[in-house]
Amino acid sequence: MTKEGVLELDSYRLLPYAVQVPCYVCEGGNAYDAELCRHCLAPMALGHQAANQKIQPRMVATIGPAAVGKTVYLGMLIDMLSRQSTGMQMLARGAFSIRLQQGVIGALRRCEFPQKTPNEPDRWNWVHCQVKSPEQRRPIELIMPDMAGEAILEEVDHAHSYPVIRMFLKKCAGLMILIDGEKVHDGTLDQDYFAMKLLTFLSELDDDPKTGWTKRPVALIFTKSDQCPELEENPAAFAQAHTPGLWQQTCERFHHHKFFATGVAGGTAFRQPRGQGRVRIPLRIEPHGVTAPFEWIVRSLGK
């Protein structure tokens, strides 16, 4: 004997997947509940937050070779601006935007430097923040990732190795390039070569005479300036004397640039863990010149 019945179909649950949600970085379509973009591995939270705001976020890149101090600089910058009660202030958007700040400050409190940024894009820390300045009537929204230096170099040498890097740099409104001032002072040429390759890559990435990289603000930041008093006195003169290739290329191709010197650790030492190589540790934290490059970038974007 066959009984009749009504079976409810659950196909309505598939309706949200019929509409693709674009990634804010590469604009590729993704499922509405995706955590990372399936094309470039950028957080989909960026796109969801941007869709609910009237002010569209702008992108600012902080890049440099491996071990230049990029993660420490970004974490300290965010921590300082988020705690200021006057002047330029920063407000994080989303819990994921606090992860970088928390990791860096936690490591420095333990008298350690944070671990090297992994090369895998799905493990990078992204920051979406609102920046308020007394000089500007309206706040601006910024997106800043902590990209691995080795991954950046790989994309420069081998195009499309990391699509997220190419797409992000193409859309960036401003750039902060970090250069190891201690290595430059010691005569190492790798820092000069890396910066020149990167600037050449950027000029070819978007060469539009009106909106390309020749018109965008570029801050060149020498890190670890506490190890070199000459650098702190005059960063531009230091660049001209010790990195002539970088100096010449910057002046010829990038009309809106400025050199800076910054440092976070007031002094460093080495310790020898058992069974491991020497590890550099900070003896004390004395940040100086950390906010100046970022403030210059923000003011340039507001013009």
Per-segment meaning from a language model:
Residues 163-303:
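Conserved GTP-binding G-domain of TRAFAC-class P-loop NTPases and closely related GTPase folds
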Residues 121-173, 184-189:
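Switch II of P-loop NTPase G domains
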Residues 2-4, 37, 41:
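Extended non-core architectural segments that shape protein topology and connectivity
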Residues 16-25, 29, 33-35, 42-120, ...:
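Conserved G1/Walker A P-loop phosphate-binding module
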